[in-house]
Every structure is written in C-alpha cells, then in structure tokens.
C-alpha cells in the first residue's frame, strides 16, 4: 500500500476495519495478529508512513498529519480492546476463585526476594568476590553515551540492531534523551570517573521495543568491564567460565565463544554454555555477548588505546534466571502471580 494509492483510499475505512477486527478478536493472541495488519512493520498505516518521503514537504506535512490522526484512532481502539479482554479474563478468574468469606482467616505470610533479584544479588556477590566494583547509572541516558561513545555514531548501521524508546526533551548540552537499551554506557561513564585498573560490573534495567516469550520491553542486564595494560581474551574466558560454574553451582559446564559482531568490541563473541548432565545436557545455550573493548570506546573513556586494553560482556539477568530455574516464559517474571513466585521463596 503506497501514498500513490491514497487518492482511492478512505482512511476512515481503515479505522472502521481496525475497530471491527479488534472487536471481533476473542483473545489476546488474535488481537496481536490483527494489530500487525494495521500497525506492524508491514501494516497498512506503517506502509503509508514509509511512503511520505516521496512527497514534497508541504504535502508530506498534510498527509502525515492525516495518517497520524488515523494511527491514534487505531491505537485507541487497540488499547480499548486489550483492556476489555483483560477485564473479561479477570472476571472469569475471579468467578473461578470466588472466596467463601465464612472460612477462617489466614495468617500473614512472609515475603521473599523475586527470582530475578536473587540472580542480581548472586551476580554481585560472585563478581565482588574476585575484586569487581558495582556501579549504577541513569536509566534515562543520552544518545551520545548510549550509542556514539560506544562506536555507533549517527547513521551507523549498528543502531538499527535495536528499537529504542526515545524521550521528549534534551539534556543540558542539547543531546537527545532515551531509555538506555543496554547497560554498556556505564563503561564510558565509570572509566571517566576512575583510573585504571578498572574492574566493574553494572547491573540495571534496560529498555527495548520488544515483547514475546523470550523478550520484554524492560529487562535487567549486567555489564562487566575490566580495563588494564595487559588484559587479554584469555582473561575474559577465564573470568566468565568461572562465573558460570559458581552461579550454577556445578563444574560440568562447557563454554564456547562464537565469533560475532558488536560495535563496541573487537573481536566480539557470543558466549554459549552447555551442561554435561541433566535435562539440558548436550544443548548449547546462548548466555552472553562479549569481546575486547574497541579502541574507539577506550579513547572515548579518556584513555590511550595504545596503552590500555580490556574486555567487556553483557548478560541478561532474566536469561540467567530462566536457565537456573528452568523457566520457559520470561513474561512470568513480570506478572506478579504468587503461585509462580512462591516456588522461589
């Protein structure tokens, strides 16, 4: 569908079709499939927006405004149907779990740490035992720290690797603000405030436009960084392999490093692990991204890349938690279902 076709296209009909499709969706899965027809990467409205670049500036402004109004109406209908389905599901659950108020009361139960927080604290403890500091940084980050300082300048193709939540407004220097897409900006922030040798991990929340059984719009990540004059890839392999064995409390773990690409490391590697025993025996499981810190990043830290070298890695805390406890769906961590959470108390 292109803008050349808009002469015969009734935008009101798109709204009507979307409202009807959403209203007829009997469950969330069907609703998300219908959403893709209109708002997905190849959806009707998305295709129209892509075609705006072919118009002259005045026409682009006019047509863009019309399409955005329609997009807002479609999104409003989608939100309303999502809420209606959620309400119906809740009412169904409440009916099934009706409480008999004549039964004796229950005593107050003690709370416990969320499984992801258990992982967070365990990671800090393990790396702290081998001399790593723990650092924290802002979740609303500047475009420069999140991308440019990490060897992804404006229009660099690596920026297309992740969809980003941008924030209205700019910082004091006029730089674009966004919700950080990884904890890697702490590499540069920490190194600018501390002199080598640098050994630090930076756990924290990160944000990307993604949501399915293995991805969440918000997820927790831990960044690791070691900078000194003689740090090699062998140090990375030794440190991370030792971490995995301590984290999973078993020695039957094989680790491999697959060549990969990240703009902020060179060489780069994906880290996979495999248990020699148990239900996951013989399966390679992706666990982390890693590599030697790129000279450009070291230079942006205010250090001389001819003198200093180091390694970095980034691991998802939910991913580690899923593997440790055998959880199949990442979204379970965010639903606050006590029946699920009590298993880890």
From Swiss-Prot:
Q: Where does Mg(2+) bind?
A: 266
State any single GO MF term: tRNA binding
Q: Which domain of life is it from?
A: Bacteria
GO terms for biological process? phenylalanyl-tRNA aminoacylation
Sorted alphabetically, which CDD domains does this protein's record hold? PheRS_alpha_core
Q: Give the InterPro entries listed for this entry.
A: aa-tRNA-synth_II (IPR006195), aa-tRNA-synth_II/BPL/LPL (IPR045864), Phe-tRNA-synth_IIc_asu (IPR004529), Phe-tRNA_ligase_II_N (IPR004188), Phe_tRNA_ligase_alpha1_bac (IPR022911), Phenylalanyl-tRNA_Synthase (IPR002319), tRNA-bd_arm (IPR010978)
SUPFAM superfamilies, A to Z: Class II aaRS and biotin synthetases, tRNA-binding arm
As to how many cofactors bind and how, the note says:
Binds 2 magnesium ions per tetramer.
Q: Work out whether the entry's keyword set contains Metal-binding.
A: yes
Sorted alphabetically, the keyword list is: Aminoacyl-tRNA synthetase, ATP-binding, Cytoplasm, Ligase, Magnesium, Metal-binding, Nucleotide-binding, Protein biosynthesis
Native organism:
Burkholderia lata (strain ATCC 17760 / DSM 23089 / LMG 22485 / NCIMB 9086 / R18194 / 383)
As recorded in Swiss-Prot or TrEMBL, the protein's gene is named pheS
Q: What class of enzyme is it?
A: ligase
- Key word Cytoplasm present: yes
- Annotated family: Belongs to the class-II aminoacyl-tRNA synthetase family. Phe-tRNA synthetase alpha subunit type 1 subfamily.
Query: What is the name attached to this protein's record?
Result: Phenylalanine--tRNA ligase alpha subunit
This enzyme's EC code(s): 6.1.1.20
């Amino acid at each position: 569908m292109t803008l050349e076709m808009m002469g015969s296209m009734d935008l009101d009909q798109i709204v009507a079709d979307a409202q009807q499709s959403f209203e007829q969706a009997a469950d969330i899965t069907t609703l998300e499939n219908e959403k893709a027809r209109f708002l997905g990467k190849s959806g009707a409205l998305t295709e129209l927006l892509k075609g705006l670049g072919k118009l002259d500036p005045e026409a682009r402004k006019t047509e863009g405004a019309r399409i955005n109004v329609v997009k807002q109406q479609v999104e409003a209908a989608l939100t309303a149907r999502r809420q209606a389905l959620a309400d119906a599901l809740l009412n169904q659950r409440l009916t099934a779990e009706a409480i008999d108020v004549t039964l004796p009361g229950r005593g107050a139960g003690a709370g416990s740490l969320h499984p992801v927080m258990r992982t967070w604290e365990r990671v800090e403890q393990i790396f702290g035992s081998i001399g790593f500091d723990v650092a924290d940084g802002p979740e609303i980050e500047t475009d420069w720290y999140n991308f440019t300082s990490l060897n992804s300048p404006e229009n660099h193709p690596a920026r297309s690797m992740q969809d980003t939540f941008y924030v209205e407004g700019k910082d004091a220097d006029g730089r674009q603000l966004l919700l950080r897409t990884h904890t890697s900006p702490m590499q540069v922030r920490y190194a600018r405030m501390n002199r080598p040798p640098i050994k630090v991990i930076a756990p924290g929340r990160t944000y990307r436009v993604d949501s399915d059984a293995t991805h969440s719009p918000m997820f927790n990540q831990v960044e690791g960084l070691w900078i000194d004059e003689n740090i090699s890839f062998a140090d990375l392999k030794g440190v991370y392999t030792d971490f995995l064995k301590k984290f999973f409390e078993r020695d039957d773990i094989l680790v491999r490093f697959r060549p990969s690409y990240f703009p902020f490391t060179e060489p780069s590697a994906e880290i996979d692990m495999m248990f020699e025993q148990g239900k996951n025996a013989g399966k390679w499981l992706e666990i982390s991204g890693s590599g030697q810190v790129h000279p450009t990043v070291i230079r942006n830290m205010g250090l001389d890349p001819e003198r200093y070298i180091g390694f970095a890695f980034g691991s998802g805390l939910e991913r580690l938690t899923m593997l440790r406890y055998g959880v199949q769906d990442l979204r379970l961590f965010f639903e606050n279902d006590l029946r699920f959470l009590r298993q880890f108390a």
